[in-house]
C-alpha cells in the first residue's frame, strides 16, 4: 500500500526499531541511503546496511538476516515485482519500499499489511482499480456449489435448470473478467519507466521533519542528476524537479547568507548553475571533455576524420588557442575562462548544437574544491562499477558511498580519474563499433554485440556502464546513419559477462527521439522471447531491460525477439 504520511507511518514506526537497509547499486540509491543514514544517526536509530546488486543477492541477504529483523527498508529495488512472492517472508516482516522503478507491482499496491510503498502519489502511476485485478474467492466458490435439498422432483428440476443457467452466466462473466484483467495488466505492465528520484523522496521526508541539511540537499541534487545522466526521466520531469530543488537551495542560502558570502575553509555552498553539457570539463581539459561528451561526440561525428576537422573549426570559431584548450581547465587563462560558457554556446549555435547548456547545481567546499552535480554522478558510478579484480562489489559500494561525504574528497577525486578512463573507453568503443559497422538492423530493432577480447570489454559487463554505452552509441549511430528508418529504431546490445560460464549481458534501449517518454518495452519482450524459446536467461537485475543470457542461446533468443516485435 502507498504510505500517505511518511513521517508518521514510516519514520516514527522504525524510529525505535532495529532496521535492515537493502540498497541497490545505483547513484540515486546511494544518495537516498546517505540522507536516511544522516537522519538515523541524528535520532540514534539502529540499522544494518546491506548493498544488493540484484534479486539473487536480495533473496540471499534476506534469508541471512530475517531472524534478527522485523523491519526492512528497500531503496531502488522491490517495487516492480511481487515482493512477497520473491522473498516468502514471515507474517511479522514489514517492508518499506522506496523505489523509482515503475510500474509498481499491483500486489504491492494492494497489500495493506506487509508492503509499505514510500512513493510520491504525484507521480502519474495509473494503477488499475482493485476490482479489475482481484476477485472475491467467495464468488468463485458459488460456481461450484450445488443445491441438494429434499424438494419435489419437478420443482427440483426447474430450480436445477435455473441454477445451470445462472452458473453458466457467472462462468461467462468470469471468463470476460479474466480476459479484461489480462488486457488491463498488459497495458499497465508493458513499459518500464522511472518515477521521482529516491534521494528527492528522502530529502522531502527530512524537510517535513525540519531536519534537512545542506549535505542532504546536495545528495538529493546528485540523485536527480543521476536520473538525468542516465536518461531515466524526461526533460520536462528533470526541469520540474530542478525547480523544486532550486527553491530549497535558495532557502538554505538565505538562511546562511552571512556565512555564505564569506568563503571559508569549512564552508559548503550549493549554487544553481546554467552550465555547459560537457562532462567533467572543470577537472579535465576542454579538448578531452568535448571529445568524450556523448552530445558533442555525436554531433561532430568525432569517430571520423571529417568530424575531427569540424571540432577544430569549432574551436577556431571561438578563437580559443589549441594550447589553452588542451591544458587542464584549471590552468586556462583567466580572461578566457570568464566568458567561456557564452563563447561555447554562441559557436555551438552556429554548428547546430542548441542544447549546450543545462540547468544544474554546483557545490563548493572551502576555497578550491568545486564540483558540478554530474561530476559527482560520474565519479561515484565509476567507483561502484570498477572491475571486480580491484576488490569485491561490496568494497566498491562502500567506497562509492564514502565518496559522497565531504570528509572523503580524496575518494571523489579518485572517482573522477576513473570516470575519465571510463568515458574515454566508452567513446573509443563507440568509434570502433561505428567504424567496423557492428551496429546492424534486425528489422524492428538495431543490434550490436561486443566481442570477447575487445579493449575494456570487462567494464561493459556491468549494467549501468553497458546501458550508458548503449545510449551513447545509439545517439552517435542516429547522427551517423543516412537511413531514416534506422534513426527511429531501439537498440539491443550484448557484452561478454563470464567466459567460464559462457554468458553475456544484454540490454535494451528505447529509440533516440526528442519526444521520447523514456519508456522501455524490452523488459517484457525479453521475458516473452526467453519463454517461447526456452533460452537460458537470468532476470537478476532490478532494471528489467537488462538480463544475463547464455551465449549459445543468443541466436534463437534474437530470432524470437525479432518475430515478437515485428
UniProtKB/Swiss-Prot annotation:
Question: Where is the protein situated, by its record's location annotation?
Answer: Nucleus
* Residues that bear Phosphoserine: 144, 146
The yes or no answer to whether the keyword Cell cycle is present is: yes
| Keyword Cell cycle listed | yes
Q: What InterPro entries does the database record attribute to this sequence?
A: CDC45
Give positions of region: Disordered: 138-161
Q: Name one GO biological process term.
A: DNA replication initiation
Q: Which Pfam families match?
A: CDC45
Q: Which residues carry this modification: Phosphotyrosine?
A: 130
- UniProt tissue specificity: Widely expressed.
Which coarse location class applies to the principal site listed for this UniProt protein? Answer: nucleus
Q: Gene Ontology terms, cellular component aspect?
A: centrosome; ciliary basal body; CMG complex; nucleus
Supply the alphabetized keyword list.
Answer: Cell cycle, DNA replication, Nucleus, Phosphoprotein
Which segments show compositional bias classed as Acidic residues? 138-152
- Which PANTHER family does the UniProt record give? CDC45-RELATED PROTEIN, CELL DIVISION CONTROL PROTEIN 45 HOMOLOG
Describe the function of this protein: Required for initiation of chromosomal DNA replication.
Describe its partners and assembly state.
Answer: Associated with ORC2. Interacts with HELB. Component of the CMG helicase complex, composed of the MCM2-7 complex, the GINS complex and CDC45.
Q: Which family does it belong to?
A: Belongs to the CDC45 family.
- Could you identify this protein by its name? Cell division control protein 45 homolog
